[in-house]
Amino acid sequence: MSKEEVLEFSGIVTELLPNAMFRVKLENDHEIIAHTAGRMRKNRIRVLAGDKIMVEMTPYDLTKGRIIYRYK
């Protein structure tokens, strides 16, 4: 998928789920399920409940996303 087709949103992690999945509340009050991007796993960036993050989503499935950045 090309980078132009990806939607990016800010959100807050509300719950940690099994298999490195997270429940995220987006800034537009939608809740999605997200997993960490491979680059974040490789650099061992921890994501905890309450963290402010950036999520990228495909326009084809707006219920799932990938966490690409954790704000400091």
From Swiss-Prot:
One Pfam family cited in the UniProt record for this chain:
eIF-1a
Where does the record place the S1-like domain? 1-72
Q: Subcellular location, in the record's words?
A: Cytoplasm
Q: Which GO terms describe its cellular component?
A: cytosol
| GO MF entry, a single one | ribosome binding
Top-rank taxon: Bacteria
Q: What are the entry keywords? A: Cytoplasm, Initiation factor, Protein biosynthesis, RNA-binding, rRNA-binding
Q: Which NCBIfam families match?
A: infA
The entry's family comment says: Belongs to the IF-1 family.
**Assembly, per entry:** Component of the 30S ribosomal translation pre-initiation complex which assembles on the 30S ribosome in the order IF-2 and IF-3, IF-1 and N-formylmethionyl-tRNA(fMet); mRNA recruitment can occur at any time during PIC assembly.
The UniProt entry, under PANTHER family, shows: TRANSLATION INITIATION FACTOR IF-1, CHLOROPLASTIC
Explain the purpose of this protein: One of the essential components for the initiation of protein synthesis. Stabilizes the binding of IF-2 and IF-3 on the 30S subunit to which N-formylmethionyl-tRNA(fMet) subsequently binds. Helps modulate mRNA selection, yielding the 30S pre-initiation complex (PIC). Upon addition of the 50S ribosomal subunit IF-1, IF-2 and IF-3 are released leaving the mature 70S translation initiation complex.
* Annotated protein name in UniProt: Translation initiation factor IF-1
Q: What is the gene called? A: infA
